[in-house]
């Protein structure tokens, strides 16, 4: 990673059939493959929420995955992104599933 890479942080919420379809496990796997950190968890209202941090281009790749791909048996209706901002350092050391 070049020193010039701008670090970004963004919160997300995924709507659709995203619980009971291994969405969190696949999200964790994709995040580790891309090289971003943060977390993912199910909400009580049937969505999946979390935060992604990393170099801007990697965060953008993860945003695309969260919007269009997901786990094999999921159905993503929409994904909302919020609180997107530049950060000076990562707040997490890895990507984890929260409960």
Curated annotation (Swiss-Prot):
The active site is at 24, 42. Disulfide bonds: none annotated. It comes from the Eukaryota. The keyword Phosphoprotein applies. Keywords: Acetylation, Hydrolase, Phosphoprotein. InterPro entries: Acylphosphatase (IPR020456), Acylphosphatase-like_dom (IPR001792), Acylphosphatase-like_dom_sf (IPR036046), Acylphosphatase_CS (IPR017968). Its EC number is 3.6.1.7. Residues 9-99 form the Acylphosphatase-like domain. The modification Phosphoserine is found at residue 93. It catalyses: an acyl phosphate + H2O = a carboxylate + phosphate + H(+). One of its GO terms (molecular function) is acylphosphatase activity. It is an enzyme of class 3 (hydrolase). The keyword Hydrolase applies. The modification N-acetylserine is found at residue 2. Belongs to the acylphosphatase family. Its physiological role is not yet clear. PANTHER family: ACYLPHOSPHATASE, ACYLPHOSPHATASE-2. This is Acylphosphatase-2.
